[in-house]
Amino acid sequence: MFQNKEQTESILVWEKIVSIFSIPSQNEILNFKQKSPNNIDNNLKQLFNFVKLYKLESLVLDWYFESIKKYFKSTLSNEFWKFFNNVNLAELDSSTTSGRQLKFINHQFALSINLLHKVFSFFKSNLFLFYELLFKKESYNFNFLIKKLQDLLITNIMHTTNQQTKYFNTILFMFFERDFISFTKSFYHSKKQILKDEEENNNNSKDLEFNDQQQEEEEEEEENEEESKSYIIMEMSFEDSITDINIKEDSFMDLCKKLQDLNFIVISEEIFTQILFKKVFEYIETRCKGVFEKSFLKSILEWADQVIFKWLAMILLSSTTTTKINNYNDIINNNDDDNDDDDDDENKENSLKIFNQWKKRLEFSIYENYSQQRISELFDMIVQYPDSLPSLEDLSICFQKIPIEKTMITNLKRVLHNRLLHPGANTSDIITQYISTIHAMDIIDPSGMVMEKVGKPIREYLSQREDTIRCIISSFTEESNEIYQELCNYDPQDNGGDDDSNNSLLAFGNCDLYVDEGDNFSSIDDFKFWIPNKIDGSSTTISIGNAKANNNNKKKKKKDTISHLVNIYDGIDLFINEYRSMLSDRLLSVVDFDLDKEIKNIELLKLRFGDSVLFNCEIMIKDMVDSKRLNLQIKNSQGVNNNNNNNNNNNNELKEFETLILSQLFWPTLKGDEFKYPKSIEKKMQIYSKEYERIKTPRQLIWKQHLGLVDLDLEIGNNIQSFQVSPIHATLIMLFESDDGDDDDEKELTLEYLSKQLEISKDLVKKKLIFWLNNQIIKETSHETYKINNKEKEEQKQRQQQIENDDQDESSSDDDDDDNNIVVEEEEEEKSTSAKEKEEQMRVVESFIIGMLINFKTLPLERIHSMLTMFNSELYTSTIHELKAFLSKLVNEEKIELVGNDFKIKK
């Protein structure tokens, strides 16, 4: 009997609950006003007590959620999508939708969210009533009920079908994108107004300094206007959105609060990602692309702080504040002491946590997009160094913030291979860009790890070029070169104070170690315990046994530019040998024995590389100094001997005869073709040798006849020409000098005669004659027969011949003479014009010829002709005979020289 009564009462309670909490009509829900929890009717409390008594809590809650689900699916979903009946959702696209249509869609979206929020608030209020009367004392989490309600709403409204999900995401994307654009324009509008006010204040001042500042602000204003234009993607103006910025932001924040309550913000993460990342990319590309002279990273972060993060705070932190968001940091640092609600504190903490996560993601995106933009232009930044220094410093900050090392190395190596490391680039240009790369990488990554990887293909490529060492050594000795300045500024004290006379070559075990100027090893033991730098460039120390490396004795390892250049060949031996060879060439061409520059260069190199490696070079300089002194001594001695012997004929034998005495073991091998000197020169050489043997007994001289310089003054007719030539060229032209007082230009010599007199081959004589032929000193009268080219006498003969011809043609009519003269003049003008055009055409091709000879060292005539025809067919249309004539002119201009059958750059 009792059991039946209990069942009956429980049924009555259930029916009462169903009647009270059944889903009302749409109007009743929308007009619902939430009551305070303290004003709950006593009858309702008693009803819920019976629910608890009969343990119907779970049953009631499940029933209510099921009722909500049915309502959402059958009624609310239809009501929501009715707002978009006039919108073609299937073709909805933010990029093609007009501003008016977009504004209508956003208005309808706001109305639909208001509807959902009112319905949600109604059910939330009832769930709160259930929680207060049924579950509060059981430590039941009210947030669990809200989360379940939110999930039901999302599932049954937006995610009923895949198509509805797509439509809703599109609408949500368009809503947030349009608001962001509007918010950005509002920001620039406000900023423009601030700049305008500052400009008005500046106009009141007549100070020149203020005028300069005003000009800078005007430039900044123009720049901001350009930035603002980049965001006006859609057909809308500032007035198209809510005119009053404050009202607009308040409306947006109110809608965002509702979206937060409905949990739509959380599910919109992908939409935020698309919008914000897209805007970050567009902003960086618009402002920074191709501009390297300014630093942009700081201004980009400030823009993100004032625009991106503030807009994001309006969305994510709208539920944590009731005031207008001017600075999101104020919300983060604000502690609502008056708020004792633990749930609100928890919600605020969660919102701040989500916001900070987003902030970090966006900051990472800024660094990533900026670094990607700069890495894609890194080669151009290197080419424009040091003008690109601000951009390189920005990239250095990105390098410290995010992992871009691998991307940067891969991209730069690829670009270097495509744009720099190819046969068309001059070696000097490659070295210049290599040096700029060293400086740029030193700014980005001071540890040097990136440069080590990026520089490897450059070093390998340069090591394969024959003129690399010569180009580098030239940069060491040219005062205008950056490397020379670095060499001058080198401080030997930075080497760590080794005892081996600052020698940078240390012996450790069986290997040679090259110590850079940045290393500071107080002893060889310090080196044993050194370990490589970390990615941030910091150094560490380790202990082995009882020995400990002292971190205080270590400095940050850093290779200078010279170290990188030397490491192309993994040592300095090749460089020193090449320098010795180049020094030999320069010293052998010295006439006045002015060695100050060479002595300075050697001293600088000794400081950098040590004394021992430059010992031979010092001996070479010493030979020059000793030769100058010995020449003076021998001349004075010879003059005294002649005066004592009353021999006036030999008094001036050695007056213009200078000899350079070389220590054969210390100079590079000096090879050349020996020949027979004229007797007058041999006589001077014998006199000099005897005096030398007398002074330097028991030493003897071994003459290098092919070396040296001869100053010649050639008098041909009434013209005197001066030349500085090699001994063999001087000897060759002296053979044309008459012995019996006759005119030199009447003397004809055959190739065979010249070969016998010089005691060299005919081919070599032919080769040496080219110089005098190109300078028009001699001419070939017949096959392998030559004579002095006296132009005055030839012109005189031609004039005499012309007079004789004119006398013979006096019987011809004047009209015919005039016609013939006109024809001849026209033909000469045509030939002259054609020759000039051909000359100009060949001069254009000259740079290509010089470039090919620099890269390939030596090339025969046929190879040069084929390469020009293949690669410059539009510019080069000459025959091989015309090319040969032009190359002869370049030889005459001493730009190139002919060695055998090959042309090469004249050294």
UniProtKB/Swiss-Prot annotation:
GO molecular function list: ubiquitin protein ligase binding
Subcellular location: Nucleus
Cellular component per GO, a single term: cytosol
Pfam families tied to this protein: ANAPC2 (PF08672), Cullin (PF00888)
Region (Disordered): 203-228, 790-838
InterPro entries with a match to the protein in the record: APC2-like, APC2_C, Cullin_homology, Cullin_homology_sf, Cullin_N, WH-like_DNA-bd_sf, WH_DNA-bd_sf
Segments of skewed composition (Acidic residues): 214-226, 804-830
Protein name: Anaphase-promoting complex subunit 2
Protein encoded by which gene: anapc2
